From Swiss-Prot:
Residues 14-242 form the AB hydrolase-1 domain. Pathway: Cofactor biosynthesis; biotin biosynthesis. InterPro entries: AB_hydrolase_1, AB_hydrolase_fold, BioH, Carboxylesterase_BioH. Its EC number is 3.1.1.85. Its main location: cytoplasm. Monomer. NCBIfam families: bioH. The physiological role of BioH is to remove the methyl group introduced by BioC when the pimeloyl moiety is complete. It allows to synthesize pimeloyl-ACP via the fatty acid synthetic pathway through the hydrolysis of the ester bonds of pimeloyl-ACP esters. This is Pimeloyl-[acyl-carrier protein] methyl ester esterase. It comes from the Bacteria. It comes from Aeromonas hydrophila subsp. hydrophila (strain ATCC 7966 / DSM 30187 / BCRC 13018 / CCUG 14551 / JCM 1027 / KCTC 2358 / NCIMB 9240 / NCTC 8049). One of its GO terms (biological process) is biotin biosynthetic process. Belongs to the AB hydrolase superfamily. Carboxylesterase BioH family.
Amino acid sequence: MSVSVERFGQGPDLVLLHGWGMNGAVWHGIVPALASRYRVHLVDLPGFGNSPLAGEVEYSLPWLAEEVAAILPEQCHLLGWSLGGLVASQLALSHPERLHSLITVASSPCFMARDEWPGIAPKVLAGFNQMLAGDFKQTIERFLAIQAMGSEHARDDIRQLRHWLAERPAPQLAALEAGLGLLAEVDLRDELTPLSLPWLRVYGRLDSLVPKASIPLLDERYPSSRSVVLEKASHAPFISHPQQFIEIIEHFVG
């Protein structure tokens, strides 16, 4: 299949991967600033936006990573938000020679809550799966609300996400279902331990999908990585706090 990419600007290559249910247009608010310094690549992950799935595929994390690897510049800085952070992390494991650095935003190597691990309650993801089977659009709306929950600009954040989501074709049900499966099942905590790439982890302290309690655990597990927490942000800090987010990225990437 062909993965759709939108490109802006000139400079070092910076590739942005969106999260579950979204598409590459979600970055449009910060593109002008980033494109003044970087060659920005906005990817639509398979099954989302302008990257329709071609027939039946085994929608696994390694498969997703290979599909994205096929359209990456020879070397780049790779940024992934939420589910896109899992894809970016898998790429860092499978193709470290292609990356100058890894940036994960509001993401976790293990999204699902487990023994002594804070994360999304299993019943929440199970609820989304049930909703998907019944009301596709309502499920997306509910997820938008959860992403903005806690943000002091929650209503504006949701409106902005909804606007950008509508700029491209709706996500395919198969990709939504498979994506929820990845959020429920993938656990890269041990695999990422030896990662030697420069790695920046960006969080919103008010995020209800990536609990703040996981941040010090990840700091301890990955001491060579750096973490930055936006105190008043939730799951979409690049939308609620764009200027602060841009400064964080520019400071790290250079």
